[in-house]
């Protein structure tokens, strides 16, 4: 079986009830969220306590001093999370059916991403033009 989701992808769109689950979760901005997430990973034992948070990419704007339209950015993060949430639900339904049919234990599940980072996020950076790479 092959399942291909178009989410998460621009344009960002999700069900209102899914977006509502994430209302307020991103209000503090990405810099604080990064710090909280690494601390939570330490507490859970997922990473070593001595591992440090990498510096924010120098091309990514500082949330506190450089983001002009925070409400827009917050909404983008809420909708993006809602898209992932709906995808997760769908994958869960597939897993449930595999278990019901008794074939889960004989199934390999691969999660693949074809796009890498979102190219539309250039507005979140100091970059104004696409960067062209050559080998």
Regions found by a protein language model. Name each.
Residues 41:
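Conserved acidic, metal-coordinating active-site core of Asp-based
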